[in-house]
């Protein structure tokens, strides 16, 4: 089980998220290479709303199937891992009087040299976190990767 150097899923999702200037070109290239891609934005004082926004966008864009449990479950774990980075391990937002404004990228595909390894999913989050007062936030980032 060897990672394919050009198919590192976490790296690709982070680069997609941070490269806003050439986003559409990058999405086309990723899709041409067999990746399923979803991009979006979410802002909330509730972590469950962040999770729901990412799941809804992923289903609408075809990154995961609407029916079934396994794909949603994998996305959930990748999203929670990314949120741990954003919130520095404390998954609370509104109850600690903080809010997030995030862009997200979800990428699905096989990052390994062997097709037998199957698909994985990566969620990258970038934006701001802080008190719900304009100007009192700071940058934050998180990434999560899970097998499907």
Curated annotation (Swiss-Prot):
One of its GO terms (biological process) is positive regulation of gene expression. It comes from the Bacteria. CDD domains: HutP (cd11640). GO terms for molecular function: mRNA binding. Changing residue 4 to A: Decrease in binding affinity for mRNA. InterPro entries: Regulatory_HutP, Regulatory_HutP_bacillales, Regulatory_HutP_sf. Changing residue 7 to A: Decrease in binding affinity for mRNA. It holds the Pfam family HutP. Keywords: Activator, Histidine metabolism, RNA-binding, Transcription, Transcription regulation. Antiterminator that binds to cis-acting regulatory sequences on the mRNA in the presence of histidine, thereby suppressing transcription termination and activating the hut operon for histidine utilization. Belongs to the HutP family. HAMAP family: HutP. NCBIfam families: PRK03065.1. Homohexamer. This is Hut operon positive regulatory protein. It comes from Bacillus subtilis (strain 168). The lineage of its organism: Bacteria, Bacillati, Bacillota, Bacilli, Bacillales. The gene is hutP.
């Amino acid at each position: 089980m060897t990672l394919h150097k050009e198919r590192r899923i976490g790296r690709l999702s982070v680069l997609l998220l941070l490269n806003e200037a050439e986003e559409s070109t990058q999405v086309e290239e990723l899709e041409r290479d067999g990746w399923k891609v979803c991009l979006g934005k979410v802002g909330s004082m509730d972590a469950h709303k962040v999770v729901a926004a990412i799941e809804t966008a992923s289903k609408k864009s075809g990154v995961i199937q609407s029916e079934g449990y396994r794909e949603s479950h994998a996305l959930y774990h990748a999203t929670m891992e990314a949120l741990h980075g954003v919130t520095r391990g404390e998954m609370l937002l509104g109850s600690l009087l903080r809010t997030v404004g995030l862009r997200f990228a979800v990428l699905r595909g096989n990052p390994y040299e062997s097709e037998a390894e199957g698909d994985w999913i990566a969620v990258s989050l970038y934006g701001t976190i802080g008190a719900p007062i304009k100007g009192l936030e700071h940058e934050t980032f998180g990434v999560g990767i899970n097998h499907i």
